[in-house]
């Protein structure tokens, strides 16, 4: 009789635990998705973390972290990953149990082969009952994205043209005077304009004196990108422009040339929602500078660009390049070179380099003719 009573108590306890664990399996459980770096190179692993934490006072005998990936995300390993039956994606799923206050961190590596912006789906946290028969899930809040910048453009003609442009930029450093930096004073000559006389120094000295300007101490440039995908079925010209722009900026970084970057492109919906009204409908740009952080901003802009322009090429060049600044200019564009030169019009002696996708076509034709 006592054995029967004990068995009944055991069954009642199991049923009670089963009911409690079914209802409260996700109580005090938090899940979060983390991306090690949202800027990832094409073809390189992008590591993401699925973290589950038990902040409650009770053990959690069964927990799982689940993330669905679209077909653009290519897993680097098949561990804990199953392919959808439709073939349109993959599902990452990790299972564990947690003590009170314990946290589990699961990581997986993905690859993205094409330039662009990719949004990760929200992570799901799954809790199970005491007997492992019933599961309930919860979708965690949060927004995560991966930005893939374009690959560099491997064109010998591009490297040759950039080499000539950078050489001319270095020469101009010692040709043009900087109207801001004063190197000293010298006697006034008949060829100097009256406005250049330094009256304060003239009173102290032995006659009229004028300021002696220093030469430009830092080479500067402006990089403008106008890539218009007029034919949606053939985005290759715009993609090539983005690749050439990356190569241009990398060469400027190597030569420690301070540059300002602007891309005439519509950007993703995240930026559209973050900015009110029509203010978002303008090109993104970086301030004058160079260095790792500056270059990283350039790569992110190139990765986010959609290939759809906001301004006409002429208006874009007019608003983002000012000849009076006497800054060298590089324009990467799908427009004809003649139209760009007519829109930019730098002052005499200021270098202007126009790069178009036709360079690649000419290179391919030259290679075929040589073969």
What are these regions (language model features)?
Residues 13-272:
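An amphipathic, basic-hydrophobic helix/alpha-beta surface used to engage anionic
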Residues 1-7:
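Feature marks short, highly hydrophobic, charge-poor N-terminal signal-anchor/signal peptide-like helices
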Residues 159, 187-371:
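Exposed, interaction-prone extracellular/peripheral surfaces
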């Amino acid at each position: 009789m006592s054995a029967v009573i004990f068995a009944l108590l055991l069954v009642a306890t199991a049923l009670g635990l089963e009911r409690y664990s079914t209802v409260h399996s996700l109580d005090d459980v938090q899940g979060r998705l983390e991306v090690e770096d949202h800027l990832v190179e094409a073809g390189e692993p992008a590591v993401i973390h699925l973290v589950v934490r038990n902040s409650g006072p009770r053990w959690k005998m069964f927990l799982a972290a689940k993330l669905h990936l679209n077909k653009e995300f290519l897993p680097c390993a098949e561990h804990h990953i199953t392919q959808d039956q439709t073939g349109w994606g993959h599902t990452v799923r990790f299972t564990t149990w947690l003590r009170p206050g314990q946290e589990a961190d699961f990581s997986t590596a993905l690859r993205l082969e094409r330039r662009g912006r990719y949004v990760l789906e929200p992570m799901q946290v799954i809790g199970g009952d005491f007997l492992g028969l019933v599961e309930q899930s919860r979708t965690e809040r949060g927004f995560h994205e991966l930005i893939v910048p374009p690959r560099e453009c491997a064109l010998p003609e591009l490297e040759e043209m950039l080499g000539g442009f950078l050489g001319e930029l270095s020469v101009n450093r010692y040709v043009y005077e900087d109207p801001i930096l004063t190197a000293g004073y010298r006697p006034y000559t008949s060829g100097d304009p009256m406005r250049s006389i330094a009256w304060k120094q003239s009173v102290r000295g032995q006659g009229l004196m004028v300021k002696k300007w220093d030469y430009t101490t830092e080479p500067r440039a402006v990089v403008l990108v106008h890539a218009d995908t007029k034919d949606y079925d053939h985005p290759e010209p715009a993609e090539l422009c983005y690749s050439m722009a990356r190569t241009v900026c990398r060469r400027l970084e190597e030569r420690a040339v301070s540059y300002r970057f602007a891309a005439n492109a519509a950007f993703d919906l995240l930026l559209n929602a973050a900015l009110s009204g029509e203010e978002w409908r303008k090109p993104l740009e970086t301030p004058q500078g160079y260095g790792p952080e500056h270059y990283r901003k350039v790569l992110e802009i190139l990765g986010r660009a959609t290939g759809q322009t906001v301004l006409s090429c002429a208006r874009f060049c007019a608003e983002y390049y000012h000849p009076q600044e006497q800054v060298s200019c590089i324009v990467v564009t799908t427009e004809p070179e003649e139209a760009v030169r007519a829109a930019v019009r730098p002052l005499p002696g200021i270098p202007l380099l126009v790069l178009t996708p036709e360079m690649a076509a000419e290179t391919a034709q030259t290679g075929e003719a040589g073969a």
